[in-house]
Amino acid sequence: MARFTLPRDLYHGEGSLAELKNLKGKKAVVVVGGGSMKRFGFLQKVEDYLKEAGMEVALFEGVEPDPSVETVMKGAKLMQEFGPDWIVAIGGGSPIDAAKAMWAFYEYPDTKFEDLITPFNFPTLRTKAKFCAIPSTSGTATEVTAFSVITDYHKGIKYPLADFNITPDVAIVDPELAETMPQKLTANTGMDAMTHAIEAYVSTLHCDYTDPLALHAIKMIHTYLVKSYNGDKEARARMHNAQCLAGMAFSNALLGIVHSMAHKTGAAFSTGHIPHGCANAIYLPYVIKYNAKDPVAAERYAEIARRMGLEGTCQQALINSLCEKIDEFNVRLNIPKTLKDFGIQEEEFKEKVAKIAELAVGDACTGSNPRAIDPANMEKLLTCTDYGTEVDF
């Protein structure tokens, strides 16, 4: 038996933010990030619509990129004091991810963060509040997923939290919010979405329900990502939809080792944080070459290439074309090809790679990767992504 879970309601299209005024409740906590939603007037619209719905509103502002355990606990404390029956998160993946974790600690104040790390081990939610997610970036798709990523900066580890309980009740996918994304964010989030769709399609848990979503998302991203990066308004709107479709796919099919590697390297190096989408973009072609040694995965990668209209007279040629296309995207989006190009220092990489490999193998996303991997091969794969060497194992 398998399960397929989505938000109960998804409102999409220009102006769909106004659906907030139709929510039924008494109190709402709005969780938001660094200030762009306030600067562009969207936060005020959210507050106004919720008040029009008859709700008292409290704000939790300042969620940082890659939210920390400490931020989650502060937000949960505000919720415990205010007592909302709606949690509304607006912004990129970070405030929505943070709000999902806050939700668990609001409803179960005695829960420890360590209790939530085990996949699909959350307590039953919605005893106090429902959840509405409003994305402003076109990548994470956390508005429709059962996932959240929280960082423990003391340990230098990103923890993917996974449970169908944290799939939002309502998602509002309004393309007006995505029009404000800067180019670099458009690039990173767009390649995050592409990675979601590709990993979902080759996952060991893919099914008839997830495959069409993943393939259509890939086709849309292939068509619209570079145009969106260059500021095309229609392409921005289509990318906002495409990333959401990719999220529906991976929330139910799960992911693979591209994400395992990104989770465990994002906060690992002293030279600076690697943005999640950027890490995914770097690792994706290397992982495709590793996974394509599995015959089932190889055929599914070839099918992706066919759907994208790429050239290739045989399966291997199609897989090569897919990897070349991803490399081309990264060049056009100004994303580095290797960790070394990103700026990771060689000595620190060598010092930490064995431990990172061990942690990546233990990541929640590794279990649904189409080809098994052990710490030794993970270390070799990470080394390829640092030096740009061929994956021949």
How does the language model describe each region?
Residues 204-213, 227-238, 253-258, 274-277, ...:
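Flexible, glycine/charged-enriched surface loops at secondary-structure junctions
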Residues 147-253, 376:
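Carboxylate- and glycine-rich phosphate/diphosphate-binding segment that chelates Mg2+/Mn2+
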Residues 348-393:
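Short, amphipathic C-terminal "tail helix"
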Residues 139, 244-280, 363-368:
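Glycine-rich phosphate/pyrophosphate-binding beta-alpha loops
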Residues 70-176:
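Glycine/threonine-rich beta-strand-loop-alpha-helix active-site module
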Residues 1-86, 339-340:
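ATP/NTP phosphate-donor binding region
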Residues 268-271, 277-351, 391-392:
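Gly/Pro-rich interdomain helix-loop hinge
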